[in-house]
Amino acid sequence: MEYKDVVMPEPLDDGKKKKKKEILNTRISPVDFENISDVGDLVESFQSASIQARNLGQCAKIFGTMLQDEEKPTIILGLAGPLIAAGLRKVIRDMVHYNMVDVIVSTGAILFQDYYNALGGGHYYGSPNADDTQLRELFINRIYDTYVDDELFVDDDTLVGKFADTLEPGNYSSRDFISRLSETIDDEESILVTARKNNVPVFCPAINDSSLGIGLTQHYYQARKAGRTPITIDSIRDNYELTQLVVQSTRTAAFYVAGGVPKNYINDSVVMAYIFGKDTGGHKYALQVTTDSPHWGGLSGSTLAEAQSWGKINKEATHSMAFIEPSVSLPLIYGYAFQKGLYKGRPRLDVEWEGDTLKKITRRRPA
């Protein structure tokens, strides 16, 4: 007997035929390089492919929709992972320069390594199989297959502390401190410098867990030793400031690169809106590129649908996740938006602070 005689002895009835036709509706389109001329075309073609290529294509499509939405949602970019070591400094800087993001929430390591590069430091080819004890003897730090100069790291830690020494004692948000720190460097390729020049707030909610925090700890120690009052980075002021941005925005959209503290912090700013008497309804758009998995239960890999149960992402939001390492996925999504020109004509967010109070948030057309 043939397979069909055993497994499919009876033909499908009309109802099942109709349902089958509904399900087998859209064909997968092969990636066709005869019709692909650039990264933008490649990523667009992924939208008709499968597996993580389709997820990446959907993330890129959502990012483009964010940029062109008539409501002009405030786009908050969350940054975690070894992005500078991976060679993405220029990509992130250009996302700011070309007005693809309005607010940044980052780990301290990313911001410090931008600062380190601005002061002449670099990242170098290495090997994950290196003799790490020898590297330690040479004061070379390893980030998987990439090396940095520990002597320069220590020098730059110290510079952060000495800069803090120049500030008036008091409470500073990470946004305020980072903006001031960026004034001490002059590098057009710097994320920090480009953000300051374009009035893009940069928050670092876990600043203590980084080389920036090491430098600030040195400042704290030296000030206490000398009987002076040190500055304090006020993490609750960070909450207060970021939540004002969320509350005063028409809508918000989130782009999470990896996960970690920045992802949850961006989401918690939506929850904290109730303190200001407002229910924002959650982010209108959300996308994430990550290698973390949902089934471990951790925040970094939790699905964006799960965030809807918390009200952090709108119940009708357009969202997608691509489980692809960010050193590959972020430049592809950026390249899609850049080469398609999806950022052009988008009014830049203009914010004005008075201490910890957001006095103005408007949009201005690009010159």
Model-identified regions with their sequence ranges:
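N-terminal glycine-rich anion-binding loop in soluble enzyme alpha/beta folds
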Residues: E2-M66
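C-terminal functional extensions of proteins
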Residues: E2-Y3, V7-P9, K17-L24, R251, ...
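Glycine-rich phosphate/diphosphate-binding loops that line cofactor/substrate pockets in enzymes
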Residues: A60-T74, T194-R196, Q244-R251
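Glycine-rich anion-binding loop/nest that anchors nucleotide
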Residues: I75-I84, I104, F203-I207, G227-L299
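Short acidic, glycine/serine/threonine-rich loops at helix termini
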Residues: G87-K90, Y115-G121, I214-Q218, I266-S269, ...
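Short, solvent-exposed amphipathic alpha-helical segments in soluble enzyme
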Residues: V91-H97, Q218-Y221, V270-G277, S302-E306
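A generic, well-ordered mixed alpha/beta core segment in the N-terminal half of proteins
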Residues: I92-T158
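Ligand-binding beta-strand-loop-alpha-helix segment within the catalytic cores
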Residues: Q134-G213
